[in-house]
Every structure is written in structure tokens, then in C-alpha cells.
Amino acid sequence: MTKLNRSLRTALAAAVVAIWPLAGQAWEPTRNIEFIIPAGTGGGADQMARAIQAIVAKHNLAKVAILPINKSGGAGAEGFLDVKGSPGEPHKIIITLSNLFTTPLATNTPFNWRDLTPVQMLALDNFVLWVQADAPYKTAKDYVAAAKAAGPGKFRMAGTGAKQEDQIITVAIEQATGAQFTYIPFKGGGAVAVQLVGGHVNSTVNNPIEAVAHWRGGKLKPLCVFELKRMPYTAKVTDKMSWADIPTCKESGLDIDYLMLRGIFMPAGVSQEHVDYYIGLFAKIFETPEWKDLMERGAFNQTRLKGKEYAAWVAKEEARHVSLMKAAGFIAK
């Protein structure tokens, strides 16, 4: 073998060794990740997305930054259409709430969850019936009785968006009890809670994380939670009560339950390798103390799903929302 051939073989071997690790590496983002929030600032989706951003940055869980972007227009349609219009783009994710189902049903906006790629269920979010702390009602039954006695439309219920989850629950209360509320929509749960604190409305069905600061501050009080069982968190939020002390609405004579998805989707057309990266990222996030604190602070139902199980759950939940929306008269014609 000539000296030239030996040199050539050595160079080729070195090139193979240099390239081989790259060929075996899993995909990672090469630029910042857009994190679309199809809701306003201050609400539950916004708070969770920004908590995820902070956790990833604090623990150096990604080599790029996560950039939360609120796109709440059209009851979240703006955000969903943005992701739908980015097929194959792995640097874009979206956090979902029930407007994943309600917005296309109520507005005929041309998108469906099947236009996206399911990645990870983060948790399920509770809804709580809230009133002002100094309101005379001790139970949900007391409150509903007062609303009925006041007459149709006299009591005002604030909620996020029109024909979305908060109004679905409001209509369910009306149908179950005969009470009639004036429903007033706002862009996000943070604004909804502020309206109740200010006395501009009589009640809300805010998610726990949207109202907990006002509860702890002595401005609001919870009457019941719209879940089949009590929340498991026993640490005191106020000097007298924990999340676990809040009765279910069914216990209080209001036989209604509703949980909301907090989940992650990507655009259609991404690869399994792209999906796996985010599943791995969220697995790391779930182990951080900040995430565990968020789960307790927001009294989340810590159900997590991914892959086929997640997609099957979403399909079943879509069918349930079709039924709920029909019952409420919210399906667009």
C-alpha cells in the first residue's frame, strides 16, 4: 500500500468517525420554539405556558428558547389556524384548552384537532364556582337559590369567551336548576377573576390557578368544584381551607362535572422524531419541583397521556363536546 493510499484511508476513516455520532443523534430544535397560546394573558393556559417557559430556561432543558405568543382572536381560532398553516414545522407547538373543540363547533372556523399532531396531555384542569368572599352564600345550593329568587338575568356570570367552556358550564347550571344568568364574556380567565373581585359580576367558574391568588388574599371564596371527586391537595391555601376542603358540586346538589384539557399539539406533517423530542422534554419538566408546585397551586388533575392513548382521549372528548354544545344550542348553522 502506497503512502498516498494509507493517507487517503486514514482521512476517510476519520471522516466516518466524525459523521457517525451525528447520524445517531436524535433530533433537536435548531432555532427558538414558538409556543402558541390560543387565549388571552393571565388565564390558565397562559400561566401554564409561561411556567413551562420558565422551567425550561431555569433548568437548561433545551438548547433554544421557548417563546410564548398569545393568539386569542376569534376565541382562539387565530392560534389554531396559525399552527394548522405551518405543516411540518417542528419549531412550533400549541397549548390547548376546550376551545380546541368549542371554537370550530361554534364558529365554523375551518380547523379540527385532526389538523394537528397530538403530543402530550399535560394535565386536566378543574373548574370552581367562585363568589366574592363577603357574599352571604355558604354553598352552591344557596347561591343558585338566590339567583333564582332574583329573577331571570339578574345575576351576572363572567367567563372566558362566548360559547366556550365557561358558558357551557353556565348553561348546564341553568338547565339543571332553572336559574337564569346574564353571561358576560372576557378574553381570559385573569380578567374574569378581576371582574368578580371588583364586584362587577356575581360569580365565575374560573380554573383554580386563575383565582387562587384572590382566594388567598381574602377577596374570593369557592363554593364547589365541578369534578366527580374532591381535589386531593390538603395543604392550606387560606388559614381555614385547602383545595381538598372544597365540596364537589354534586355534593352540593348541583350534579354537573367538567374537566378541561391542558395539552400540547404540533402542526400536521411533523415526524415521530419531532414528537419524541417534545415528549422527552415534557418528561423532564414533569420531574422539576416547579412543575410539581404548579400542579398543587393550580389544583390540577394530574392525568397524563401521550401517543395513541392521548389521541383516543381527544376523539372521545370531541364527541362529548358535540353533545354538550348541541344541548346548549351553541352549534353554528
Language model features: what each stretch is:
Residues T2-L12:
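Bacterial N-terminal signal peptides that target proteins for export
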Residues A13-A14, G24:
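Cleavable N-terminal signal peptides
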Residues I19-A23:
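N-terminal signal peptide c-region/cleavage motif recognized by signal peptidases
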Residues A26-D115, K154, Q175-N207, H214, ...:
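N-terminal (or domain-start) structured segment
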Residues P29, K58-H59, K63, D82-K92, ...:
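Hinge/capping helix and adjacent helix->loop/strand transition within the periplasmic-binding protein
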Residues T30-N32, A179, Q272-K333:
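An extracytoplasmic/periplasmic, membrane-proximal ligand-sensing/linker region
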Residues D46-R50, A54, Q167, V171, ...:
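Short, surface-exposed alpha-helical segments at coil->helix boundaries
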Residues L124, K138, V212-E287, K316-A319:
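C-terminal lobe and pocket-closing loops
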